[in-house]
Amino acid sequence: MPQPLKQSLDQSKWLREAEKQLRVLENLVDSNLEEEKLKPQLSMGEDVQSPGKGEPLHPNVRAPLSHVVRAVTTDLPRLGNKLPARHHLGKLSGLYQMKGCTFNPEWKVPDISDTHFDLEVINECPSRNWKYLTPAKFWPKSISYFPVQAGVKPKYPDNVMQHESIVGKYLTRLYEAGILYKRISKHLVTFKGQPYNWEQQHLVNQHQIPDGATSSKINGRQENRRRRTPIKSTCRQNDTKRDSDMVGQVSNNRSRIRPCANNGGDKHPPATGSLACWGRKASRVIKSGSSRDSSASVDSRRRSKGPRGFSTLPRRETTGNDHHSSDISNSVEATTRRRSTPGESITLGDSSIIPDGTSCASDKDSSPKEENVWYLRGNTSWPNRITGKLFLVDKNSRNTTEARLVVDFSQFSKGKNAMRFPRYWSPNLSTLRRILPVGMPRISLDLSQAFYHLPLNPASSSRLAVSDGQWVYYFRKAPMGVGLSPFLLHLFTTALGSEISRRFNVWTFTYMDDFLLCHPNARHLNSISHAVCSFLQELGIRINFDKTTPSPVTEIRFLGYQIDEHFMKIEESRWKELRTVIKKIKVGEWYDWKCIQRFVGHLNFVLPFTKGNIEMLKPMYAAITNQVNFSFSSAYRTLLYKLTMGVCKLRINPKSSVPLPRVATDATPTHGAISHITGGSAVFAFSKVRDIHIQELLMTCLARIMIKPRCLLSDSTFVCHKRYQTLPWHFAVLAKQLLKPIQLYFVPSKYNPADGPSRHRPPDWTAFPYTPLSKAIYIPHRLCGT
């Protein structure tokens, strides 16, 4: 293509070439969108281009990208209707056609440890974030409750009982780790682990549970304990006859009463009575002498917690079966001791039967006595219903031996109960490129069970109820299925990252449960990482050392990117998978919009590492927005494949150059002008009158094609913002592709040097104030110093 002389732009040959290019651009603009193939059709559209007989399976990508883009303008993809279409594109499938989960009867429940961070972290890591986290609150606008029997989703119809059994074991493991509350009655729950300060005021002694606080099913009939005729408590302590009558009544009624915590599930009939059902009567059997004797075995750790720490009664050795004692006196003894011991509760074992902590202590094979169980009467009622449903899947594609618990609290994010969760800063790729330090060794840390570090207010926990079909549990820590949890985790790790950066003088970046530490000295960074891990563990924050970098490295994988000392890139395996998917596109066939949605998600991730732009994906976005089928054309498939071939890596902390503008453009409804800083100018007449922003963009694109400047001056904000989605698609793609690599500066019309030539006056380059209109990238203050 002929290049103009810098002294003047009015070269005859150059002008003829420029006029030709302008007419091509005008033809693209004048194509009416209603007549194009991008409009949703009422029929399937038989004129869709079909692949030829000799067409190769892989697209031809030898042509330059600019030629491929121009070819798409004549061979457009199409939108269809909402009839059933293909929902498989290579290995991708529609979101509602996910690969069915396979049940594994040998699933193991992963090890879940107690994650209780010390509240001293508020003083060690001062931040305003802690007032939102100690405790976190969750207040949905409205709640839909479901029956307890629907607690486990029927994900595996052929293995319902086994599925529910493993879910029960999983919930038991979470309960034992202090992550769940377990429902005892309408106003009473139990939990394990160390209580928080806000829970201390609601802890209760078992002996203080008032009469009539619970209800239970008796012979299949729901009765209120308050309505039953209780034994009068006016008896004297020395009246042994009345005591023996009470013992007989308690033991005789034992076989008829089910545990009141068996919330609607008869799948695993209990072997003994519940604590909450037997507490009021069994506690009266205890002699005052034994109560005095029990005061000697006070747990020192609980005593230090304050006046609400409770003592445990010593067990007496008995003989007989731990779970099914037929001897009346033994059963009453066990019931009495169980009721009088505030540090014990009924939990689910492997067989969903009462564990060793509630049975006699004479069995040498039984587990040691549980001492970290607490009873809490919150300032709320604990519903015998659930708000979320559960099912199990493989932990990940590489680990199918362990199960992962999926909690469905989608009612809080969609439908009539949808909540607007708070927004928080999350770095995009451009921000990440600018905040990462160049040429520094790096170490990554990963939090273990990150969400389970976040405690919830007990009243909020009652809104997050789940069940295995037998017991009702409430999340004491933040669950992963609620949209509020990522926001809380962001606050949590941000507060920790700020203190780590300040205390250890190291560059720190946090995103969800990932920490990235950078320092110029690798040896110093290695020692810092050990100090940081010790600091976090002293505060009760657990580190996943399996996913933590053991020593400083120069290349690290973070947020899905491969990051070395100077560049960011994407793994080659990901490119190969995407090329394979594009090769399997069948030209002319209709694809379901859900399948296209998944495909666009993969393309969006790699698009910044290509020479393409987001406008190239707009036809697929149109299909997703209108929820209609989509058909690929041959040229469009070639364009997508061409994008994956031009792989590039992005430089970390790119140099921001501000070149001096040397070319300016301007337009009127009838004429356009290009002006050079050397004084040369060229004026063009448009073939028809159009909107002024279209004419301005035409002249800017023409200047880019004919002169190839590093930057351009324009008095159109529409042109400078580079948002062309309102234009016909094929012209928007070309304009975005042409103007993406260069900087556009805005100049007021009265100072635009090209304003004179467009109005048949000489250009004026003496004074022209200009500014870029691109929005500055937001970077947190603590990351701005790098």
UniProtKB/Swiss-Prot annotation:
This is Protein P. GO terms for biological process: DNA replication. It comes from the Viruses. Residues 1-200 are annotated as: Terminal protein domain (TP). Belongs to the hepadnaviridae P protein family. SUPFAM superfamilies: DNA/RNA polymerases. Residues 314-326 have a biased composition (Basic and acidic residues). Residues 365-653 are annotated as: Polymerase/reverse transcriptase domain (RT). Multifunctional enzyme that converts the viral RNA genome into dsDNA in viral cytoplasmic capsids. This enzyme displays a DNA polymerase activity that can copy either DNA or RNA templates, and a ribonuclease H (RNase H) activity that cleaves the RNA strand of RNA-DNA heteroduplexes in a partially processive 3'- to 5'-endonucleasic mode. Neo-synthesized pregenomic RNA (pgRNA) are encapsidated together with the P protein, and reverse-transcribed inside the nucleocapsid. Mg(2+) binds at D446, D513, D514. The keyword Metal-binding applies. It holds the Pfam family DNA_pol_viral_C. Residues 207-221 have a biased composition (Polar residues). Changing Y96F: Complete loss of reverse transcription. Terminal protein domain (TP) is hepadnavirus-specific. Spacer domain is highly variable and separates the TP and RT domains. Polymerase/reverse-transcriptase domain (RT) and ribonuclease H domain (RH) are similar to retrovirus reverse transcriptase/RNase H. Changing D513H: Complete loss of reverse transcription. Residues 201-364 are annotated as: Spacer. The record marks Y96 as: Priming of reverse-transcription by covalently linking the first nucleotide of the (-)DNA. Its EC number is 2.7.7.7, 2.7.7.49, 3.1.26.4.
